[in-house]
Amino acid sequence: MITSPPNEQTGEHTGSWLGVFALALAAFIFNTTEFVPIGLLSNIGQSFDMTPAQVGLMLTIYAWVVSLMSLPMMLATRNIERRKLLMFVFGLFVVSHVISAMASSFAILLVSRVGIAFAHAVFWSVTASLAVRIAPPGKQVQALGLLATGTSLAMVLGIPLGRVLGEALGWRTTFLGIAGVAALVVFLLARALPLLPSQNSGSLRSLPILFKRPRLMAIYLLTAIVVTAHFTAYSYIEPFTQTVSRLSGEMTTILLLVFGGAGIMGSIVFSLFSDRFPNGLLITAIGTLAVCLLMLLPLSGDATMLGTLTVVWGMAIMCFGLLLQARVLSLAPDATDVAMALFSGIFNIGIGGGALLGSVVSSHLGVANVGIVGGLLALGGLGLICYTTFLFGKTQPHAEMQADAKH
């Protein structure tokens, strides 16, 4: 890791758990707002006389704006000091949420979500590398785990609480509440983060170099396939549980809580085993995800079995996301922000693609089949990781970077 001179006061020599914690809270806010519509599809649809499948397209639009803008926004902001950049990002985030809460039409709601997506594109392009950068020495994996905990808590608390608030006071109140919490997080970030001059951000010149790294390209392809598989089913978990499983609104909220809690368990598994069994854990996570999605419909009639499946599903997808994030950082240490911007963009292509595919499946085959379609895609991802593990198993990751340096 490249360090800065002491007079820059970056705080990177001793590390800062407080700074990592602040970033984890920020991650909580961003992941809450990205996925909270999943628990409010029916309510938003009622406001604008739309079906859940139609409203679900807002997830696709949001995700694809993030995917398209992640790299351009990262490059446009690559020379900006990172703490200042995060302050600007959260300012845009708060204003856009206020507009969401006041939206008089679905079109205005979509415009406000695009504003949030722009903020999201910048945030996730820099946050993982910042967490690793400011973590105490030797605690980089744990820092990523804490960041993932913030993401998981969005599933555990953010999305279910957003749903409860939306059910009780209307979905607009949920967006106002997110704006209020985000405003508080801004102050914490300002106090907790040191000055963080941009470093190792990369530039457009980094792209041809990154594209020559087969391991990295395989990770990006795997990301697109598996994330699409997951969100084909997860984007429509609310209508699935209510129309197929016949669960009440309260039980649906509990199921969302269970899924998020499982994500925290998955981040713990990642912290404990990712260093020792990186390939085995990744293959296991994808295989487990495929089984969970394929069994979603067969187990939908038994609430206990569905809850158990949800726990395993949540653990698997969290392990998968963390493993790929860590692998991208390790394969592109010379251009972390560019590599993570690409990863964030591709991840969101998967989110949007999954939401769109789930909408098509729901409209033409019925929402009951979203798990089957997602599971088949996940099996494709399992085949890809098994092949690439065999192909690159004996190749050291640094060999690719050394080859780049010779050109």
Curated annotation (Swiss-Prot):
GO terms for cellular component: plasma membrane. PROSITE patterns: MFS. It comes from the Bacteria. Keywords: Cell inner membrane, Cell membrane, Membrane, Sugar transport, Transmembrane, Transmembrane helix, Transport. The gene is sotB. This is Probable sugar efflux transporter. PANTHER family: PURINE EFFLUX PUMP PBUE, SUGAR EFFLUX TRANSPORTER. GO terms for molecular function: carbohydrate transmembrane transporter activity. It comes from Pseudomonas syringae pv. tomato (strain ATCC BAA-871 / DC3000). NCBIfam families: PRK03545.1 (NF002921). Involved in the efflux of sugars. The physiological role may be the reduction of the intracellular concentration of toxic sugars or sugar metabolites.
